Each structure stands twice: as structure tokens, then as C-alpha cells.
């Protein structure tokens, strides 16, 4: 009686033949295009956890999902005027500088306030600044900085101010359609190819415009065409929610802003974070810590009183925030505990996932 052939033997032989064939292809690819042109995903940085740049608020870090802004990716921050967009980017610059990182600010609007930047914790003596004349110049500078591999964070303020050379050379009444959109599309094609290798995060601040004659759907859109929407791994929408009132009813000391993650390729999208931004001081780290501590039951609230276990922290939210601001050690202890709770046990949600076109899918 003849012995039956084990189908597993054929399967194993087939797999070995395929592996041998792809190894020959890999050798030829590396010969033509250089070492590392084709590798298994687990051997590359793409297959590992993404590094991130802290935002300055643990609530926003949680909403983004990976503990901050992703390195090696494009980030877009957009919203109405005076909603806190530039504040978010300056806070990120301050955070990366604290770890010894290098940041650059491409000020296409020519409106960066060094006094305000310093108040937010930015070391302006170490911040690289460019105030380009044209959009092409701004994006070329960004490309050079990324290729250098020496810059951790680049901020472009703003997309709306990236004026194409042809528009500057033309007359005021000239009609030039799609110049800025084509400029952004070409620049982003070049930039994204080199971003991941340099591990640089580039953040674009963008403004909102209104669509004319729209009957259904939101009339709001962002400037610069659709390229930035597609190439961005993270898109944050910033809105002012309400004013923060001080000791008297007519004393406005800041704003509460809501940051919504409308697109996220590195974690689940559509999360929100509400932050307190004080005038002249920036994002309140202590307010974010307090809100997160209440959320995760590290701090208990009873009426207007706040306690941490058996220890009373104070009465009234603003008083407790002020107390945490003075007691740096306690604030740091709370933040470290929160980061362990939120980020230290990686789940499938915190892995690098490609949720492409998340914003478009929602629509």
C-alpha cells in the first residue's frame, strides 16, 4: 500500500521556495537602491512604537493617544482666529526644548511675538527662526531642515500665509486659481518621503475659510487645498469654548479651548480634550493634571473641596490649580502616576495603526 503524501510537506517546500525567491529579489533591490530598501516591518522603526513630543497637557496627550505629537509625521492644527493654535505649537516647542531637542519656527505671517513665546517657556535664544518672503522659500527651508536630520520639531505659521511667487509677482486683480494648492501638494510629496527617516515632526498651522453657496454640510474648510488633509497623520481642530473668569466677573484671565482629533493615523480618532489657556502664560499644565486626576480617581472632589486621599488640596478649582502650580513636586508626582495609568500598559489602541481617511469616513 502506497504511503499518502503529507500536504504539509508541499506547503513547507512552497514557503521555502518563496522565501528564497524574495531573498534574491531583496539582494537585487538593495544592490540597485541601497541597503535597507526592503526589510521586514518588524525590523524597521515603522513596526515599533512611535516616539512623540509632549504637548504640555496630559489631557491632550491622552486624546492624541500616543503621549504627544508623533515624530516623523505631518501634523495640522486648524481653527478660527484667536482659538489657541499658535499657543499649542509654542507649548510643543517649549516641551521639546526641555528634553534638549531643537526646534525651528517658520513664521510666514511675520507675527511671532518673542515676549509671549518666552512666557510660555520657549528658549528664544535656542529657537531657529525664519521669516520667508514666499511660500516656495518657506517650504524649501522646511525641506532643508528636515534633510539635515538635526531638527526635532518644525512649525509653519501658517498655510494661509504661504504666498506663491507667481501671486506676489502678479497684479492685485489677477485671478490665479489653485496656485497655493499645487504648491502645498508638491511640497508635501517631497517632505513626507524624508520625514520618517529624520524623525522630525512638522506642524502646519492653518486657518478656516467659508465655502460660498453651500446648502448642505459644514460651510467651513481649510486653506491650501486637500493635500495637507491627506498627508497629515494628525489633524487637530481647536475651538474656543468659554472665557475663564478671575476674582471678579469682569476680570477675564483666559479661555477654555476644546481640541478635537478629527484625523488620527497613529491612534483612534475623534477624541477631545478641554484645556485652560491663561493670557500671557499659555496652557495650564496644572489644570490638565487636576482634571485628569479627578477622571482617574487620584483626586476626589466633594462639592467645592478637593482631596488626595486623606489630604485636602483646597477649596475651589482655581485655588487648587494655584496650589499645584506652587507645589511642583506634588504636580509632578500626580502627572507621573497618570502617565503610568494612561500610557504604560500599551493596548492595541496605542499601537501604530493606519486609520486612513478617518475624517472622510466619518463624513
UniProtKB/Swiss-Prot annotation:
GO molecular function: ATP binding; ATP hydrolysis activity; ATP-dependent DNA damage sensor activity; damaged DNA binding; single-stranded DNA binding
Major localization class: cytoplasm
InterPro entries assigned: AAA+_ATPase, DNA_recomb/repair_RecA, DNA_recomb/repair_RecA_CS, P-loop_NTPase, RecA-like_C, RecA-like_N, RecA_ATP-bd, RecA_C_sf
Keyword Cell inner membrane included in the entry's annotation: no
SMART domains hit by this protein: AAA (SM00382)
CDD domains: RecA
Chain segments annotated as coiled-coil in the UniProt record: none
This protein's record includes keyword Cell wall biogenesis/degradation: no
GO biological process, one term: DNA repair
Cross-referenced SUPFAM superfamilies: P-loop containing nucleoside triphosphate hydrolases, RecA protein, C-terminal domain
Binding positions (ATP): 79-86
Cellular component, GO annotation: cytoplasm
Places the protein is found: Cytoplasm
Highest taxon listed in the record's lineage: Bacteria
Pfam families registered for this protein in UniProt: RecA (PF00154), RecA_C (PF21096)
Keywords: ATP-binding, Cytoplasm, DNA damage, DNA recombination, DNA repair, DNA-binding, Nucleotide-binding, SOS response
Protein family per UniProt: Belongs to the RecA family.
Main function: Can catalyze the hydrolysis of ATP in the presence of single-stranded DNA, the ATP-dependent uptake of single-stranded DNA by duplex DNA, and the ATP-dependent hybridization of homologous single-stranded DNAs. It interacts with LexA causing its activation and leading to its autocatalytic cleavage.
Protein name per the record: Protein RecA
Organism: Borrelia duttonii (strain Ly)
Amino acid at each position: 500500500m502506497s504511503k499518502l503524501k503529507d500536504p504539509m510537506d508541499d506547503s513547507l517546500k512552497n514557503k521555502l521556495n518563496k522565501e528564497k525567491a524574495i531573498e534574491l529579489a531583496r539582494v537585487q533591490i538593495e544592490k540597485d537602491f541601497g541597503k535597507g530598501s526592503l526589510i521586514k516591518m518588524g525590523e524597521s522603526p515603522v513596526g515599533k512604537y512611535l516616539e512623540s513630543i509632549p504637548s504640555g497637557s496630559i489631557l491632550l496627550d491622552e486624546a492624541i493617544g500616543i503621549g504627544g505629537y508623533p515624530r516623523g509625521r505631518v501634523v495640522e492644527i486648524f481653527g478660527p482666529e484667536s482659538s489657541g493654535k499658535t499657543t499649542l505649537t509654542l507649548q510643543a516647542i517649549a516641551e521639546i526644548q526641555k528634553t534638549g531637542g531643537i526646534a525651528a519656527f517658520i513664521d510666514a505671517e511675520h507675527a511671532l511675538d518673542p515676549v509671549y513665546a518666552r512666557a510660555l517657556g520657549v528658549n528664544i535664544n535656542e529657537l531657529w527662526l525664519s521669516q520667508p518672503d514666499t511660500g516656495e522659500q518657506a517650504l524649501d527651508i522646511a525641506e532643508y531642515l528636515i534633510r539635515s536630520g538635526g531638527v526635532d520639531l518644525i512649525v509653519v505659521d501658517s498655510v494661509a500665509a504661504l504666498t506663491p511667487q507667481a501671486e506676489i509677482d502678479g497684479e492685485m486683480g489677477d485671478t490665479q486659481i489653485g496656485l497655493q494648492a499645487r504648491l502645498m501638494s508638491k511640497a508635501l510629496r517631497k517632505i513626507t518621503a524624508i520625514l520618517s527617516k529624520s524623525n522630525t515632526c512638522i506642524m502646519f498651522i492653518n486657518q478656516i475659510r467659508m465655502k460660498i453657496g453651500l446648502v448642505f454640510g459644514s460651510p467651513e474648510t481649510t486653506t491650501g487645498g486637500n493635500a495637507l488633509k491627506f498627508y497629515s497623520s494628525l489633524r487637530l481642530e481647536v475651538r474656543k469654548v468659554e472665557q475663564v473668569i478671575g476674582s471678579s466677573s469682569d476680570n477675564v484671565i483666559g479661555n477654555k479651548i476644546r481640541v478635537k482629533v478629527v484625523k488620527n493615523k497613529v491612534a483612534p480618532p475623534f477624541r477631545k480634550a478641554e484645556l485652560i489657556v491663561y493670557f500671557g502664560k499659555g496652557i495650564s499644565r496644572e489644570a490638565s493634571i487636576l482634571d485628569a486626576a479627578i477622571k482617574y480617581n487620584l483626586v476626589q472632589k466633594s462639592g467645592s473641596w478637593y482631596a488626595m486621599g486623606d489630604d485636602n488640596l483646597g477649596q475651589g478649582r482655581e485655588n487648587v490649580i494655584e496650589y499645584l502650580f506652587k507645589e511642583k513636586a506634588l504636580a509632578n508626582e500626580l502627572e507621573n502616576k497618570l502617565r503610568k495609568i494612561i500610557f504604560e500598559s500599551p493596548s492595541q489602541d496605542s499601537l501604530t495603526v493606519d486609520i486612513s481617511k478617518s475624517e472622510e469616513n466619518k463624513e
